[in-house]
């Protein structure tokens, strides 16, 4: 089956009209192509500009853990080659949890990579009761391996407010290392009513989550929010009492859809038209998040990488909008997105070739 990156023509399906294409969604040569890879509850999202420059956000799990047969790095490399890439220009690591940074050493050893972007040093210390078998997969153990792996590569630590142009794709860091931008981005600054009832949360899933390098990506008039595993309390600082980010067109649902993130205040502020959730079959996609995202103003459609097995049918999207609906043993199918500079969004389920345009 041909993918977005291998066919550079456009076939319109109409505004919010679904269609079944024989080979997957066909995209114009001036579109931004996005592939949300299935790395079994980890994170790995590939962005390819019309200039054929590339950005990978996160790298999934280490080999033989999480995503296996093939592992996360192999899935990323296969996607890059499928889209005609011989190099990944930028790899951005949002934070140093195993499901986000684990695949990087294997990736760097097997495929050319340019510049590495991150939030700076890991500061998470393993809890005293962590089982010995888990210690090698904690940030304290993974971060030294990360530094060893990126040695010799161009490396940039992004701070809040830093920007980067990747061809016609423009990146702005809105949080990094537990710090938010000081001033609202252009078009932001609205008071968010949901802030009045928002209370701090005493759980964060690990300190590195709160230190996620969260970015807003701008492509023409289109805006995309990709916040890694940014936590509820950091969202409160970023969106309350006034929104510092502004509305977006596409939202990569934070933290795999965990209820430790994805506050009503953030969804009110971002008001995405389309959301893609990179959940696993039994990881993320919490009921509270499903309800919050589904109620976001302007939302036309939520897509899921997996059926959320812990939720009922009312808290999963219809199977048409799920890339991997099977109970275990899926085919690691991606969700692909084509974004135009005018803000048009076409999302394709690679399992079926079904596309919908918004």
Regions found by a protein language model. Give the residues of each.
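Non-globular, low-confidence helical/coil segments that flank catalytic cores
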Residues: 2-6, 10, 25-358
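Bacterial N-terminal signal peptides
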Residues: 10-23
């Amino acid at each position: 089956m041909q993918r977005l990156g291998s066919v550079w023509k456009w076939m319109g399906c109409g505004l919010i009209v679904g269609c079944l294409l024989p080979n997957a969604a066909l995209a114009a040569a001036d579109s931004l192509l996005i592939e949300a890879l299935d790395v079994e509850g980890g994170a790995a999202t590939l962005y390819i500009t019309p200039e054929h420059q590339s950005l990978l956000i996160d790298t999934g799990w280490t080999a033989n853990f999480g995503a296996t047969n093939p592992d996360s790095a192999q899935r990323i490399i296969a996607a890059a080659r499928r889209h005609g890439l011989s190099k990944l220009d930028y790899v951005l690591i949002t934070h140093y949890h195993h499901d986000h940074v684990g695949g990087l050493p294997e990736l760097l050893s097997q495929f050319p990579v340019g510049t590495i972007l991150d939030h700076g040093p890991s500061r998470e210390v393993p809890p005293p009761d962590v089982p010995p078998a888990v210690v090698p997969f904690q940030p304290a153990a993974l971060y030294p391996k990360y530094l060893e792996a990126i040695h010799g590569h161009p490396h940039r630590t992004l701070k809040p407010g830093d920007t980067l142009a990747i061809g016609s794709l423009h990146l702005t860091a809105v949080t990094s290392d537990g710090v938010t931008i000081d001033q609202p981005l252009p078009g932001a600054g609205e008071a968010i009513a949901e802030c009045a009832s928002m209370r701090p949360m005493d759980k964060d899933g690990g300190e590195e989550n709160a230190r996620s390098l969260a970015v807003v990506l701008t492509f023409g008039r289109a805006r995309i929010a990709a916040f890694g595993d940014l936590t509820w309390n950091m969202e409160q600082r970023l969106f309350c009492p006034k929104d510092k980010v502004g509305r977006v067109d596409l939202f990569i649902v934070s933290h795999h859809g965990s209820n430790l993130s994805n506050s009503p205040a953030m969804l009110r502020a971002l008001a995405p038209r389309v959301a893609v959730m990179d959940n696993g079959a039994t990881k993320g996609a919490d009921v509270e998040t499903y309800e919050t995202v589904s109620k976001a103003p302007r939302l036309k459609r939520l897509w899921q990488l997996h059926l959320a097995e812990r939720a009922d049918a009312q808290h999963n999207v219809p199977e048409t909008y799920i890339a991997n609906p099977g109970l275990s043993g899926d085919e690691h199918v991606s969700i692909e997105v084509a974004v135009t500079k005018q803000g048009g969004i076409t999302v394709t389920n690679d399992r079926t070739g079904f596309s919908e345009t918004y």
